[in-house]
């Protein structure tokens, strides 16, 4: 429950609770409160202000924290797992699991992916297979890596957070 405060309403002292999620104009003038994650809900922000995200249909199931690739799926702007082995560079990442055919919220690179595990603080990471990351970049001189994607993704801030960088990619 959000914090409450005392206010004079129609000549009487009343306890009023801050608004966590706005229902729109009915909440005009309310004081806002942080949600359970310690952040403001997007519904209380002005139009045009909020997370820089893109909505796309998932053409396959996506796990939380996976890096994804935009593509055209039969004329539908869609998203699938990024993969260094089959030419699918990473365009962004998802923070929540998404079922196939559901709408995914994709966060662009240059943000923090906080849904990973097993990272080493300060280590650099590259795109792996099936939306994952790897601590070892592909060897450009290995003929077995021909036509694979070499894409630096960022540096680990913690065991679960990768500060991503939109550094581009190279097809080997």
Regions of interest found by a model, annotated:
Residues 15-25:
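Intrinsically disordered, low-complexity regulatory segments in eukaryotic proteins
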Residues 35-36:
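Beta-strand repeat architectures
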Residues 44:
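Short, flexible helix/strand-to-coil boundary loops that buttress conserved ligand/catalytic motifs
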Residues 2-10, 25-28, 47-172:
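Glycine-anchored, exposed beta-strand/edge motif detector
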Residues 31-32:
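Small-residue hinge/turn detector
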Residues 39-41:
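Proline-centered structural pivot motif
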């Amino acid at each position: 429950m959000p914090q409450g405060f005392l206010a004079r309403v129609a000549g009487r002292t009343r306890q009023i609770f801050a608004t966590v999620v706005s229902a729109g104009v009915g909440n005009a003038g309310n004081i806002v409160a942080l949600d359970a994650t310690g952040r403001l809900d997007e519904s209380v922000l002005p139009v045009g202000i909020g997370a820089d995200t893109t909505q796309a249909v998932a053409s396959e199931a996506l796990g939380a924290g996976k890096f994804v690739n935009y593509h055209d799926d039969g004329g539908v702007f869609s998203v699938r797992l990024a993969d260094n082995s089959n030419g699918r560079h990473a365009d962004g990442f998802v923070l929540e699991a998404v079922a196939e055919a559901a709408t995914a919220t994709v966060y662009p690179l240059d943000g923090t992916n906080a849904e990973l595990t097993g990272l080493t603080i300060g280590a650099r990471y590259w795109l792996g297979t099936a939306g994952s990351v790897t601590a070892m970049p592909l060897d450009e001189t290995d003929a077995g890596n021909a036509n694979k994607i070499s894409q630096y993704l960022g540096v680990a801030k913690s065991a679960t957070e990768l500060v991503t960088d939109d550094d581009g990619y190279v097809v080997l």
